Amino acid sequence: MHKRGENFGLNFNKLPAFTEVFKHMACLTLYHYDRSTAAQRVRLLLEEKALPWKSVVVDTARGDVAQLPDDYHRLNPKGLVPVIINDGAGIAESLVILEYLEDAFPEPSLRPPSPQARANMRLWMRKIDDGVHVASRTIGVCLVNRHIYKAKSAEKIEKYYAQMRDQVRRTNDQVNIASGLDSPLLPDALATFRRLFEEMDLTLSESPWLAGETYSLADIALVVYVRRMASFMMAPLWHDLKHLNEWYERIAGRPAYESAVVSWGDVTEQDRKEHGQAAFPQVARLWKSES
């Protein structure tokens, strides 16, 4: 029988890796909101690793800055989410956060074992900063968000623009809110996603995961965009990409996905469905024109 004070021969003072991980596990605070794709992938990694974390919801998409700490813009000059705080230190940018958490809490590992597979993982993740994330926002604003923003007063829209510190994001939003489905930026954004999904499908025809045989940060980083496009009722556009769809279902069936993504919901879900369905015929024509 285990008696008080017994440690079964283990000297925890000689387990610095264990004690360091245990010490930091309770110190994670995530600034995020429900439907942010960048925040979704960070939550997904936190749940896959079963790390305890404190939630601070800040809906920056709606101009909610009341809960941001005074030095938030020092942590992320763009003023966006997510930002994660660990033991007093702040880390911004979701892809950097994924790599940081993998370094800080390496078990269970979400990097493939071989150097080649790890390189492939990072090449997939690089696509996000090379255009996928900007394209995702363009599609979302053109299809759905423009209706939400245009319902506001001119004064509130100007205030919204004034709060945006990312010049590219502000300029794109101004074009996309004004032009909607006729935005000159929409065709290229849809083409970016069509190429991405087709490339993913081809890769997944040869391996179960994007970086090979191992579920990795690449899968976590990119799955949120399939969900985002599907939230606009656009899934029929890639119904023939069998391997992509099977991959998505495998991830969606993981307990971590339920707790990190599904359970947080989306306060704009109904708007996405209604405006997405209305936009589908024109979007489908643009999607096909890029074939």
What kind of region is each of these model predictions?
Residues E6, S36, F232:
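Alpha-helical and His/Cys-centered functional microenvironments
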Residues H32, Q40, D64, A211, ...:
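C-terminal or late-domain output modules
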Residues V132-E249, G253:
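GST-like fold's C-terminal all-alpha helical module
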